[in-house]
Amino acid sequence: MGNREMEELIPLVNRLQDAFSALGQSCLLELPQIAVVGGQSAGKSSVLENFVGRDFLPRGSGIVTRRPLVLQLVTSKAEYAEFLHCKGKKFTDFDEVRHEIEAETDRVTGMNKGISSVPINLRVYSPHVLNLTLIDLPGITKVPVGDQPPDIEYQIRDMIMQFITRENCLILAVTPANTDLANSDALKLAKEVDPQGLRTIGVITKLDLMDEGTDARDVLENKLLPLRRGYVGVVNRSQKDIDGKKDIKAAMLAERKFFLSHPAYRHIADRMGTPHLQKVLNQQLTNHIRDTLPNFRNKLQGQLLSIEHEVEAFKNFKPEDPTRKTKALLQMVQQFAVDFEKRIEGSGDQVDTLELSGGAKINRIFHERFPFEIVKMEFNEKELRREISYAIKNIHGIRTGLFTPDMAFEAIVKKQIVKLKGPSLKSVDLVMQELINTVKKCTKRLANFPRLCEETERIVANHIREREGKTKDQVLLLIDIQVSYINTNHEDFIGFANAQQRSSQVHKKSTIGNQGTNLPPSRQIVIRKGWLTVSNIGIMKGGSKGYWFVLTAESLSWYKDDEEKEKKYMLPLDNLKVRDVEKGFMSSKHVFALFNTEQRNVYKDYRSLELACDSQEDVDSWKASLLRAGVYPDKSFTENDENGQAENFSMDPQLERQVETIRNLVDSYMSIINKCIRDLIPKTIMHLMINNVKDFINSELLAQLYSSEDQNTLMEESVEQAQRRDEMLRMYQALKEALAIIGDINTVTVSTPAPPPVDDSWLQHSRRSPPPSPTTQRRLTLSAPLPRPASSRGPAPAIPSPGPHSGAPPVPFRPGPLPPFPNSSDSYGAPPQVPSRPTRAPPSVPSRRPPPSPTRPTIIRPLESSLLD
């Protein structure tokens, strides 16, 4: 039974399944399947058993199928079954198959009617089946029993939808003929996921159990309640047949005899029964497989491309080749050197867009981090001026000097140059760490050989640390060279003359009033900016207030905020001095004041301007900045150290001018030194560390690897890598084979066009007003009789009224006479006691009227309520 094309097609699909099941990827490859959907006791399991030709599925009342059963039928000379959870075990007794299904179901769901979405995978080999893959799903129910949860209806629905929503799943909607087809939950679920009806095939079971005098002819002919793929009727064995040991072969013969002998079905007997259902499914499966092949091929090609680059390295792997390890070692070291160079020097191909490479990070160290460390090394202005003052006084000793001593300048400059050692050595440490990180990233390619990876990393890291020491020695030497000779004749150095002139300009204040904006740019250089609180003015106005202050060489201005758009006032620095103010008892601020030596008002009606900071360090810093602008402390408020310590700021104008001169000289010379150091340190690191490490890797690494350990030990492959290589090669071959199989399928098969769409709106409107279903009984429920052709039979049979019990024989009654039908012959030879159908037009004379309504007597029983109402 079955067609030869399908017998050639499905083994190819099964080969696809087998190829990927071995790799654990069958779940990722959505191969076409057929899902059997229906209500409880609809005959789903019986349909499956007819395919297999054996009794092997559990039977009983209520919910029997409690887990999805994935059934793969394979044509074979021998007859046996295999479970995925019992690999290698063949079941030749199908009673054992039934017991194993029940036992496996109970292992997961328990023994009290519980359900689970975990499928049972069963493959049946038999000469009596076609090659098909089907899924038996739990029957649709609404009332929970046993251990079933209250939402059993929704759980089963979700489980069914999990399978039938896949676009590559054909839906076998099973509905008993003795129930209302219009309310079939199976067809409604299929309609939800397959609105076009391209994947849905209707199956009508229990045709032999319909009430006498009724049939499902109009449904099977797809005239009433149509589906795009139509319906196939089947007759399954009854429980009595099973108890009587009626085998499948006898059941098939009985099914064939039923359709040939039944007057309503014998003209379509060749399109009914399990054999025809198998052929229909095979053809639909063929079409579906061919339709899904393009997407399937794209998926396989995508997987193949994703691993092809990696597999390329494994293709030429020959474990038996004695020179393999030597070649591999040379290739690995060469690749490591290339990777290291690319990460340091940069590369135009395969640019990493996720993180900075080692070379880019070193560039940031050279041009961002190192200059920042130098700038961060700020001079304490107050401390620096004190040191300059001490140096001048100590050089003069007991004498009173007339000139600014250059030895004080050299002493201060040398001390500041030595401070550059810290940032310079720190930059060496940062570059060394980045080189080691780069080596670790490059050795990831050597991870397949653990010992080689470990030795390479160790040897190169040791060399980097060795070069680190030599680089630091050279950096310290550069600093010492700068300390050894102070070149005051440098072209960029301002010299003593310019420094003294600049210092004298600080003391010569021009009386320009409040016109600082007209000064030349050199006089408008900002010395300091920051927030200060004006305390004495704010007290009279209800509280102190903060302003943004800007100090230049000529004025002190304050603004509303740091955007410097709204200027409040600009105070000239002429004749101003600074003094300390005692902190108030309740105040947390530190205050200093500016006042005019000529007893003039500083700001409006105020003789002094009291400014507050959050800390004493801020006060000292502002006072030092004011000193640079020429605002000196008041003598009367200068505190002397009684323990022999010198005063913080000398009030000797000559000394202050000398301090300012040396301060300017120190600034000028240190800018020259900083520029030189910022240029030389990166060059030194580049030459002694980075370039040296690159040369070492290219020229000496291989020799040191050979001398450090035996070659065979170095090139021992990790177990994980060997397994991974074998797995990748197997995957690669399986993907290539799968693509070849797809090509074979396209060659040996032909698609058949889908049938035209039909009006299946009855599925959408059945909730509101279900139409009469001929699969239960034909009912004459119209308010007025439809016009019929004339008939010679006389009045139509009566509509029987329902008896007191649903199973009691009906009592017929006759309505008024109907118009006669045009023909009187009965082409179906119905028995005399059952009125037969009216004859239809011969095939050669097409009828212009719709098919006449049936005239056989029908039995009226109460309508079954829809499961979806």
Curated annotation (Swiss-Prot):
Chain ranges of the GED domain: 659-750
G4 motif: annotated span: 205-208
Reaction(s) catalysed (UniProt annotation): GTP + H2O = GDP + phosphate + H(+)
Domain PH, first and last residues per copy: 525-631
InterPro entries with a match to the protein in the record: Dynamin (IPR022812), Dynamin_GTPase (IPR001401), Dynamin_GTPase_CS (IPR019762), Dynamin_N (IPR045063), Dynamin_stalk (IPR000375), G_DYNAMIN_dom (IPR030381), GED (IPR003130), GED_dom (IPR020850)
One cellular component (GO) term of this entry: synaptic cleft
Pfam family, one: PH
CDD domains (UniProt xref): DLP_1 (cd08771), PH_dynamin (cd01256)
Keywords, alphabetical: Acetylation, Cytoplasm, Cytoplasmic vesicle, Cytoskeleton, Endocytosis, Golgi apparatus, GTP-binding, Hydrolase, Microtubule, Motor protein, Nucleotide-binding, Phosphoprotein
Residues modified to Phosphoserine: 769, 773, 853
Region named G5 motif: 235-238
Residues recorded with modification Phosphotyrosine: 231, 603
Positions of the UniProt region annotated as Disordered: 752-869
PROSITE patterns: G_DYNAMIN_1, G_DYNAMIN_2, GED, PH_DOMAIN
Region of interest (G1 motif), residue spans: 38-45
Positions contributing to GTP binding: 38-46, 205-211, 236-239
Entry's Gene Ontology molecular function annotations: GTP binding; GTPase activity; microtubule binding; nitric-oxide synthase binding; protein serine/threonine kinase binding; structural constituent of postsynapse; type 1 metabotropic glutamate receptor binding; type 5 metabotropic glutamate receptor binding
Domain (Dynamin-type G) ranges: 28-294
Residue span of region G3 motif: 136-139
Function according to Swiss-Prot or TrEMBL: Microtubule-associated force-producing protein involved in producing microtubule bundles and able to bind and hydrolyze GTP. Most probably involved in vesicular trafficking processes, in particular endocytosis.
Family classification: Belongs to the TRAFAC class dynamin-like GTPase superfamily. Dynamin/Fzo/YdjA family.
UniProt name for this protein: Dynamin-3
Annotated gene: Dnm3
